[in-house]
């Protein structure tokens, strides 16, 4: 039983179909990662090993962390940039084999940096699904100049293509900063016209909005509801985000209904 549980609005337990929280692991040690799970695993659904961090760590350490996360009912997966590097080097089959041997059951397929045409990306999603992986795809470009070339209708088309190819959910690119990328302006504010265009046309239960900033998290929760799917959450902000979801923080107190 949690402290003050009589003051805590209930929320759906895991495995959740909505209200997903994805957290970014940029290289935590096993002890720190376990401490994090001990205090906050109930509020985390996915944890992403950021970009290309995994090749810098020992295989036994990576496997230990993968197994540990899963023991807390948290699904770990490698960041999409690592997949793009594998594709660039014509090592996709080897990438799948290594991911499986390390214990990963979920992969991210993206084309945010490496040029992978939509048709090829969809083929790779299908390939990963056929290999037995759950796939999270990502839509958007890492380079703000390239990302700005995507109109809202382009994002809708790309999301739909990924879902048809077999992606379970689609991440909307915002990078670690949440600024000057995707639906965010240079200050991290949401471009509301673009946001509304996407929410009117896409299934919200299949979208994970990357929202590293607190103001962005509050916006999504007030606009879509506490069961909105949010990603790229810093590890130290897991509990804070959960309080926002439940109306246990001034930003949403009395404004959310679970």
Curated annotation (Swiss-Prot):
E.C. code: 4.4.1.19
Membrane spanning residue stretches: none
Matches recorded under InterPro entries: Aldolase_TIM, Arch_ComA, ComA_synth, ComA_synth_sf
Recorded GO MF terms: phosphosulfolactate synthase activity
Keywords: Coenzyme M biosynthesis, Lyase
Swiss-Prot/TrEMBL catalytic activity: (2R)-O-phospho-3-sulfolactate = phosphoenolpyruvate + sulfite + H(+)
Known pathway: Cofactor biosynthesis; coenzyme M biosynthesis; sulfoacetaldehyde from phosphoenolpyruvate and sulfite: step 1/4
Any Pfam family: ComA
Alphabetical GO biological process terms: coenzyme M biosynthetic process
UniProt-listed NCBIfam families: arch_ComA
Similarity field: Belongs to the phosphosulfolactate synthase family.
Task of the protein: Catalyzes the addition of sulfite to phosphoenolpyruvate (PEP) to yield (2R)-phospho-3-sulfolactate (PSL).
Protein name: Phosphosulfolactate synthase
Upper classification of the organism: Archaea, Methanobacteriati, Methanobacteriota, Methanomada group, Methanobacteria
């Amino acid at each position: 039983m949690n402290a003050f549980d009589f003051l805590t609005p209930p929320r759906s337990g895991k495995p959740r179909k909505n209200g997903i929280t994805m957290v970014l692991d940029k290289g935590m040690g096993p002890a720190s990662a376990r401490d994090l799970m001990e205090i906050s695993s109930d509020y985390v659904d996915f944890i992403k090993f950021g970009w290309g961090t995994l090749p810098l760590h020992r295989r036994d350490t990576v496997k230990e962390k993968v197994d540990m996360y899963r023991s807390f009912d948290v699904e770990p997966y490698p960041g999409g940039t690592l997949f793009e590097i594998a594709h660039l080097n014509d090592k996709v089959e080897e990438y799948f084999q290594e991911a499986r041997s390390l214990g990963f059951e979920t992969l991210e397929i993206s084309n945010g940096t490496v040029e992978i045409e939509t048709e090829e990306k969809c083929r790779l999603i299908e390939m990963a699904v056929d290999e037995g992986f759950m796939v999270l795809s990502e839509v958007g470009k890492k380079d703000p100049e390239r990302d700005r070339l995507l109109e809202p209708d382009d994002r809708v088309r790309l999301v739909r293509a990924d879902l048809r190819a077999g992606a379970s959910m689609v991440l909307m690119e915002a990078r670690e900063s949440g600024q000057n990328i995707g639906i965010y302006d240079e200050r991290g504010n949401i471009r509301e016209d673009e946001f509304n265009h996407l929410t009117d046309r896409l299934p919200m239960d299949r979208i994970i909005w990357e929202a590293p900033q607190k103001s962005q998290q509050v916006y999504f929760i007030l606009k879509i509801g506490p069961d909105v799917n949010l990603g790229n959450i810093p590890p130290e902000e897991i509990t804070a985000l959960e309080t926002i979801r439940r109306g246990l923080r001034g930003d949403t107190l009395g404004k959310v209904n679970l």
